[in-house]
């Protein structure tokens, strides 16, 4: 009986959190940035450590953006599974892909923040977009994000996430 109460309590709690998120987080509009020569440069920054199984798909989706002024930077954070080799091969044939080899992490830094910091230092865009290596972008992700950032006074946007399972 106690397990039933715990289960019902958990469902009520998670339903409340979901409801609050639906209210607070607005989806990006389906509008695209109007054509102009003044589109800000966007840097898509991808920290990657041992992501050989997903990195090519991530990079490929990032490069297929319907936006004229962007670069993709991928930092190989000392991977041991072949991620660096895949990135070296891709950056050799793709112009706006920048492959960065991560530096040794200082003692007072954590791994992912250090990788993101290195990416931010190398990026040349006015807008920095950070994604994980297991993320695939829709072709209109960058235009929608730029449009949303220009329409509202915001310093960050959160995209719609499509998950394969409940536990993701």
Model-derived features with residue positions:
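Acidic donor-binding/catalytic loop of UDP-sugar-dependent glycosyltransferases
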Residues: 82, 131-148
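Short, well-formed alpha-helical segments that are part of the catalytic scaffolds
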Residues: 23-32, 51-64
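N-terminal membrane-anchoring/stem segments of glycan-assembly enzymes
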Residues: 1-36
């Amino acid at each position: 009986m106690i397990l039933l109460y715990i289960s019902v309590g958990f469902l009520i709690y998670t339903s409340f959190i979901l409801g609050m998120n639906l209210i607070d987080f607005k989806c990006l509009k389906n509008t695209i940035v109007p054509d102009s020569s003044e589109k800000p440069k966007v840097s898509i920054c991808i920290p990657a450590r041992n992501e050989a199984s997903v990195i090519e798909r991530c990079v490929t989706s990032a490069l297929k953006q319907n936006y004229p002024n962007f670069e993709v930077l991928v930092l190989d954070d000392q991977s041991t599974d072949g991620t660096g080799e895949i990135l070296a091969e891709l950056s050799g044939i793709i112009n706006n892909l920048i492959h960065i080899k991560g530096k040794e992490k200082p003692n007072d830094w954590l791994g992912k923040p250090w990788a993101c910091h290195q990416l931010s230092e190398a990026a040349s865009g006015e807008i920095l977009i950070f994604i994980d290596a297991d993320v695939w972008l829709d072709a209109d992700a960058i235009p929608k994000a730029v449009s949303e950032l220009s329409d509202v006074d915001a310093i960050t946007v959160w995209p719609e996430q499509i998950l394969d399972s409940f536990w993701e």
